[in-house]
C-alpha cells in the first residue's frame, strides 16, 4: 500500500471486474423498471399526496388554486378544497 492509502480497492479495479457488472446489469435495470412502475401506476401520487393531473381542476373550480397570503393560508386552502 502506498502512503496515505485507506486500504480500499481502487475504483478502476471495481468497475473493471466481472462481478461488478454481473450485479449491476441486474440492479440498474431493476431500479429503472421499479421507478417506472411506481410512477405509471399512480402509486407515486398516493405516496406523496400530490393530486393526479386530472384532479388539479374540478368542474366547479377552473381557477388556479394559489395561496396568495401566507397569514391566511389555512383559510385559503380550506376554501380551495371545499369547492
Curated annotation (Swiss-Prot):
Cofactor note: With its partner (PsbF) binds heme. PSII binds additional chlorophylls, carotenoids and specific lipids.
Biological-process GO terms, alphabetical: photosynthetic electron transport chain
GO MF annotations in UniProt: electron transfer activity; heme binding; iron ion binding
Gene Ontology, cellular component aspect: photosystem II reaction center; plasma membrane-derived thylakoid membrane
Cofactor(s) annotated in UniProt: heme b
Subcellular location: Cellular thylakoid membrane
Keyword Transmembrane: yes
Membrane topology field: Single-pass membrane protein
InterPro entries xrefs: PSII_cyt_b559_asu, PSII_cyt_b559_asu_sf, PSII_cyt_b559_CS, PSII_cyt_b559_N, PSII_cytb559_asu_lum
Coiled coil (UniProt feature): none
Residue sites binding heme per the record: 24
UniProt xrefs under Pfam families: Cytochrom_B559, Cytochrom_B559a
Domain of life where this protein originates: Bacteria
Family annotation (PROSITE patterns): CYTOCHROME_B559 (PS00537)
Annotated TM spans: 22-36
Function as written in the Swiss-Prot or TrEMBL entry: This b-type cytochrome is tightly associated with the reaction center of photosystem II (PSII). PSII is a light-driven water:plastoquinone oxidoreductase that uses light energy to abstract electrons from H(2)O, generating O(2) and a proton gradient subsequently used for ATP formation. It consists of a core antenna complex that captures photons, and an electron transfer chain that converts photonic excitation into a charge separation.
Subunit architecture: Heterodimer of an alpha subunit and a beta subunit. PSII is composed of 1 copy each of membrane proteins PsbA, PsbB, PsbC, PsbD, PsbE, PsbF, PsbH, PsbI, PsbJ, PsbK, PsbL, PsbM, PsbT, PsbX, PsbY, PsbZ, Psb30/Ycf12, peripheral proteins PsbO, CyanoQ (PsbQ), PsbU, PsbV and a large number of cofactors. It forms dimeric complexes.
Family to which this protein belongs: Belongs to the PsbE/PsbF family.
PANTHER family xrefs: CYTOCHROME B559 SUBUNIT BETA-RELATED (PTHR33391:SF9)
Name the UniProt record assigns to this protein: Cytochrome b559 subunit alpha
Species whose genome carries this gene: Synechococcus elongatus (strain ATCC 33912 / PCC 7942 / FACHB-805) (Anacystis nidulans R2)
Gene: psbE
